[in-house]
Amino acid sequence: MFAVSPSSFSPTTISPRRSGQRNEPRKFSVVRAGAKRILYGKDSREKLQAGIDKLADAVSITLGPRGRNVVLAEKDTIKVINDGVTIAKSIELPDTIENAGATLIQEVAIKMNESAGDGTTTAIILAREMIKAGSLAIAFGANAVSVKNGMNKTVKELVRVLQMKSIPVQGKNDIKAVASISAGNDEFVGNLIAETVEKIGPDGVISIESSSTSETSVIVEEGMKFDKGYMSPHFITNQEKSTVEFDKAKILVTDQKITSAKELVPLLEKTSQLSVPLLIIAEDISAEVLEILVVNKKQGLINVAVVKCPGMLDGKKALLQDIALMTGADYLSGDLGMSLMGATSDQLGVSRRVVITANSTTIVADASTKPEIQARIAQMKKDLAETDNSYLSKKIAERIAKLTGGVAVIKVGGHTETELEDRKLRIEDAKNATFAAMREGIVPGGGATYIHLLDEIPRIKKNLMEDSYEQIGADIVAMALTAPAMAIATNAGVDGSVVVQKTRELEWRSGYNAMSGKYEDLLNAGIADPCRVSRFALQNAVSVAGIILTTQAVLVEKIKQPKPAVPQVPGIPTS
């Protein structure tokens, strides 16, 4: 039974004593903190660096077309993977301070995955080099805060140059190049993503699922994606991806704020009886109701997630109507006097699949609602042709794009579970890189872009003349810029320093192709990176590097050493 009373978990409140009230003895809760291990200054940074190096070493071997795989053993499963963020998140070191360093670098991978969906390995390599060079400078007397400021200013200017030199994606070949590179030079994946994007257009959505066969196929279905994520991370069902994933979910669509859990009880009990999840799309939900839903979700009584209404003002109502139509739900509008208290399960919509991240929600429509969707699209196209209002035209066009773009479901197959999981990760990276490239364009790949950005460092340093330590920050970033190309070359069995030197002599578009072993125009050769991924890698790397370089002490829990066993003497019993 769904529990609506929060009393079992509501915090205890303390009321002031009234006049004449008997003074009860105060009760205190004693919290015993574990013993801490403390390291200061250089020692703390060296320990953190050791953990960072161990994680970065494990991840960097996967970079580039000649990168290696990593075997990941977890409980009863063995995975062979080439995905930076998966490797990074799986690493836990026995030394607590080293593990703290590794955990900080894991944040780079997680941020990259959330912001760009790819480039985690590059970001980790950049961060490691910034931290290593920065720690050395600080050990020799450089001011940590000034060094950090210099690094931040340098990266800010490099990002501006990067965006200025970015080239818009032009056609299927560019998409194929980006997707192939991101998938570890897998041309099958590159072709798959390019053909899929061609079917659904730049506004479409790609969903990735496991196939029941060894074949990989693409099905285009009706669906929609909007920019609102889950209201609580406690709704997450896929911990690895930090996503909520529902199959055959029921959907409640309303523009009202939910302030009482009693409004939801009949719907929650019905979906629980049917063993189907419930997605609630609402204007807002009170903290108390959200807490009740989370507690019941944790106890396994319900399977639910809540997202806020997408859109702004008038556009919000139209989007909710489109979602209701697409899912076959009744749009429970407060303006029309429709109360949530009297809502029934018949007013809920249906979906084939729902995927919710921290920032977005994707709904794949059930086949039963397809005729209604097509009819709505036809009506909106008629409205678009008849309106002279430029603002309305834009909004109607956006709604049409959301409904017509559809959702391409890539059903990934493999002969073994290991092959299937590896291919899914590669396709996921390729998908994310492709949409990033379509948003902000492409730059030369293979680490060449970062090497060519070295030409900007002298100019940037001139603007940092007031503070010599800030100039050191610029030099630290310059040292880090060569690291991705060095790692790619090393994995290909080539001297990285030679690759860096020769690439610096070439023009912007050119660099070393680790697949062919040639120095050439990388964009013509199909070696391209999304500008969005390249800039986020720099920004996320310098962010965590700045935190670590300005760290002066580390406190971690002491590991309790087991007491030595008492040796047993023959003939004398032990107590």
UniProtKB/Swiss-Prot annotation:
GO terms for molecular function: ATP binding; ATP-dependent protein folding chaperone. Gene3D superfamilies: GroEL, GroEL-like equatorial domain, TCP-1-like chaperonin intermediate domain. Keywords: ATP-binding, Chaperone, Chloroplast, Nucleotide-binding, Plastid, Transit peptide. SUPFAM superfamilies: GroEL apical domain-like, GroEL equatorial domain-like, GroEL-intermediate domain like. GO terms for cellular component: chloroplast. Residues 1-27 are annotated as: Disordered. It is found in: Plastid, Chloroplast. Residues 1-32 form a transit peptide. One of its GO terms (biological process) is protein refolding. Residues 1-18 have a biased composition (Low complexity). Belongs to the chaperonin (HSP60) family. Involved in protein assisted folding. Part of the Cpn60 complex composed of 7 alpha and 7 beta subunits. This is Chaperonin 60 subunit alpha 2, chloroplastic. It comes from Arabidopsis thaliana.
